[in-house]
């Protein structure tokens, strides 16, 4: 599987981020073609210190080529363009050809 991880830095207004993300951004992401799995959540820490990032999302595809086609599609472009509407802290995107080490 090919994984795209989007790391969202801490936004200026967390409540506005949460509202826009759940009501507007998630529906756009759900329209991206070829996504096999979409997982997201707010970051936490084991020691109680503030996490280094606010939230992250992971999109899984069969291959790197599928991921590229999905993000180049109109639906992928719409979702990417929407990020500027709520992610005031910025984002980092990570791309991984995932290998399962343990079942």
From Swiss-Prot:
A Pfam family that the UniProt record links to this protein: EthD
Family annotation (InterPro entries)? Dimeric_a/b-barrel (IPR011008), EthD_dom (IPR009799)
Spell out the SUPFAM superfamilies in the cross-references: Dimeric alpha+beta barrel (SSF54909)
Q: Cite the EthD domain residue spans from the record.
A: 12-88
An example molecular function term from Gene Ontology annotations:
oxidoreductase activity
Under the heading PANTHER family, the entry gives: BLR8190 PROTEIN
Q: What's the protein name?
A: Uncharacterized 11.0 kDa protein in thcB-thcC intergenic region
């Amino acid at each position: 599987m090919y994984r795209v991880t989007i790391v969202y830095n801490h936004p200026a207004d967390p409540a506005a981020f949460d509202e826009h993300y759940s009501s507007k951004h998630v529906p756009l992401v759900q329209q991206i073609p070829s996504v096999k799995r979409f997982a997201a959540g707010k970051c936490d820490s084991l020691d109680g210190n503030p996490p280094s990032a606010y939230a992250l999302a992971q999109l899984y595809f069969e291959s790197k080529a599928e991921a590229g086609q999905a993000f180049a599609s109109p639906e992928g472009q719409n979702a990417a363009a929407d990020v500027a509407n709520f992610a005031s802290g910025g984002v980092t995107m990570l791309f991984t050809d995932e290998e399962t080490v343990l079942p």
